[in-house]
Amino acid sequence: MAIHKWKLWKQRCSTCSDALSTTTTVEQLSNTPTTNPLTTCVGAKEAQTQQRKRQRLTEPDSSTISPLSVDNTNNQIHCGSGSTNTGGHQSATQTAFIVHLKGDTNCLKCFRYRFTKHKGLYKNVSSTWHWTSNTKTGIVTIVFDSAHQRETFIKTIKVPPSVTLSLGIMTL
């Protein structure tokens, strides 16, 4: 540690006298921060002191934010046996019909590139992504404007046997 301090001190000095031995200089640096009359350093006082680390910026307390303040709509999808909502009803919020393709990441990437021939059959396609807990299975999300467009896509595109297809609705 003392040698490291000495090297830092030596680097900060633009002109230093080598009249003192290394041992004397190290002892001086480790004991007191005063300067020796035989050695002089030219430079600003701020340059000779070690810089402190920057303070972290404080983030607002997230515990004060209620779930309703993030999304001020109170729309719920009811999927119970007595519910008439089958998942196809679009409420006041923006919902999108989606398909998740799950499988090997390289297979999904190649399959996704083949979609460019059928651009009218979907709205958007995500890149290949995966959950952090499961890195072996990749997922591609395809977004559609309507349920009819999604059905046309499923009928037109031949899905490889190693890829599984899941239907869903996503709130945007």
Swiss-Prot record:
- One BP annotation, GO: regulation of DNA replication
Tell me which domain of life the UniProt entry assigns to the organism this sequence originates from.
Viruses
Question: Among its keywords, does the record have Metal-binding?
Answer: no
Indicate the segments annotated as coiled coil, or none if absent.
none
First and last residue of the signal peptide: none
Q: Where is this region: Disordered?
A: 45-69
The record's comment on protein family reads:
Belongs to the papillomaviridae E8^E2C protein family.
Q: What is this protein called?
A: Protein E8^E2C
